[in-house]
Structures are given as structure tokens and as C-alpha cells.
Design a protein with these regions (language model features):
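A solvent-exposed, acidic/Ser-Thr-rich amphipathic alpha-helical stretch
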Residues: 9, 30-89
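Residue-level detector of alpha-helix boundaries and kinks
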Residues: 4, 17, 46-50, 101
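A beta-strand edge to alpha-helix "cap/lid" segment located at domain peripheries
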Residues: 2-7, 66-142
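Short, mixed-charge, low-aromatic patches
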Residues: 15-26, 49-54, 69-73, 94-96
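Short, low-complexity N-terminal intrinsically disordered segments enriched in polar/charged residues
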Residues: 1-35, 140-141
Length: 142
């Protein structure tokens, strides 16, 4: 459930909601950003011009996502699958998000697999895989 504290990131609310549903009972924090450890590491195993392969730190992640709504506005997150390895503290989330690319008006439908490591009820590592072709087609209209 998204809160007003992060209203400038409202274009991502369906993402926040679907992943927090998948992490329910495993992390502390009402909002996705609140569930992230200050020194967490995020790895993005896809490449887009200007997007880093690794982001270190909660505040850096928040800053990186600050312009998301200029490019894509999400409308829905669904198809959630959750696989939890309790011994290792690792959760694999499979989900989809749907929305619209702002500049092209193209539909944006994407599938993700996120491998999340949790320690002390906070996200400490996030490895993200997605269908980069779906994103590229929505953003370029091609």
C-alpha cells in the first residue's frame, strides 16, 4: 500500500503494491521504500541507456526512480508468484505490471522476476530481471 510520503513516485504504486503483497509478513515498513535497508544493493540485470547496473543505498534508489512517471505510468500489478527460501532469507517474486508509456502512448506490459534477500526484516539485496524488449517497445513505440 503506497503512502502520501512518496506521492512523487505514484506512477510506481502498482509495482509497490504487488511486491509488498509478495513480501507481506517478511519485511517491516508500510511502503516499499520503508522496507529497504539504508545500505541495500539493487542489481538490474538488463541494460537501458542512462540506467545503472547497480544502485547502492536506499536513498539512491529513491532518487533513481524519481523520474519514472515521466516515462511510464503503471496502472496495475498482478500475476504474483512467491517462492520463499526461509533458511537463506531469500524470496523470489514473479509478477507483471501494466501501464502506458507517456511519450508514445503505447501499452506497457512487462514481466519481472525479482530475487530479494531479507535480513532483520529489511530488504538488503534485490536482483531484478525483466522483459527488456517489452520496455523498449513501449518507450520507443517500435
Amino acid at each position: 500500500m503506497a503512502t502520501d510520503r512518496y506521492r512523487e513516485h505514484k506512477a510506481l504504486n502498482p509495482f509497490f503494491d504487488v511486491v509488498m503483497k509478495g513480501l507481506k509478513g517478511l519485511v517491516e515498513g508500510e511502503h516499499y521504500y520503508d522496507a529497504i535497508a539504508d545500505d541495500a544493493q539493487f542489481e538490474f540485470l538488463y541494460r537501458f541507456p542512462g540506467w545503472p547496473a547497480v544502485i547502492r543505498g536506499r536513498e539512491n534508489l529513491i532518487a533513481a526512480y524519481s523520474g519514472y512517471g515521466n516515462n511510464i505510468v503503471l496502472e496495475k500489478g498482478d500475476r504474483l508468484g512467491v517462492h520463499h527460501d526461509k533458511e537463506r532469507g531469500v524470496v523470489t517474486l514473479e509478477y507483471q505490471v501494466h501501464g502506458k508509456a507517456v511519450k508514445t502512448g503505447a501499452a506497457y506490459d512487462n514481466r519481472f522476476v525479482s530475487i530479494v534477500t531479507i535480513k532483520n526484516r529489511k530488504i538488503v539485496r534485490w536482483r531484478d530481471y525483466m522483459d527488456s524488449l517489452a520496455a523498449w517497445q513501449a518507450l520507443t513505440g517500435k
